[in-house]
Amino acid sequence: MRHKLAGRKFNRTSAHRQAMFKNMAVSLIEHELIKTTLPKAKDLRRVIEPMITHAKNNDTVAARRLAFARLRDRAAVQKLFAELAPRYQERAGGYVRILKCDFRAGDQAPMAYVELVDRPVAE
């Protein structure tokens, strides 16, 4: 039975799902704004928020290695610890905002923007 199992399968294997969310997390850290489907956006929040909290609470070599093990991208780990952790030092969670936008043209899937709150806006 499927009682109280968290997360969605997205019709993918567990390795594919893990790789998809790793790639999405790296893209979100790099660009600070991405567009994806609404269910993926909701599950991405469960991946990225603990990473930011962990980076914020302890900037050690072990914490950086754990982040690198999950992201596999040196630039993303550097930005996570150098820019994002200090930015959210005073914020107790809620680092990600999900904004519903339109529906995808091909299959009418609900789309959403995922952005990091308090991000600098280009003028």
From Swiss-Prot:
Organism superkingdom: Bacteria
Keyword Ribonucleoprotein appears in the UniProt entry: yes
One of the GO biological process terms: translation
GO cellular component: cytosolic large ribosomal subunit
Disulfide bonds: none
Alphabetical UniProt keywords: Ribonucleoprotein, Ribosomal protein
Keyword match Lyase: no
GO molecular function ontology, one term from the record: structural constituent of ribosome
InterPro entries: Ribosomal_bL17, Ribosomal_bL17_CS, Ribosomal_bL17_sf
Family annotation (Gene3D superfamilies): Ribosomal protein L17
Family under the similarity heading: Belongs to the bacterial ribosomal protein bL17 family.
Subunit structure: Part of the 50S ribosomal subunit. Contacts protein L32.
Protein name, entry field: Large ribosomal subunit protein bL17
Lineage of the species this protein comes from: Bacteria, Pseudomonadati, Pseudomonadota, Gammaproteobacteria, Cardiobacteriales
UniProt gene name: rplQ
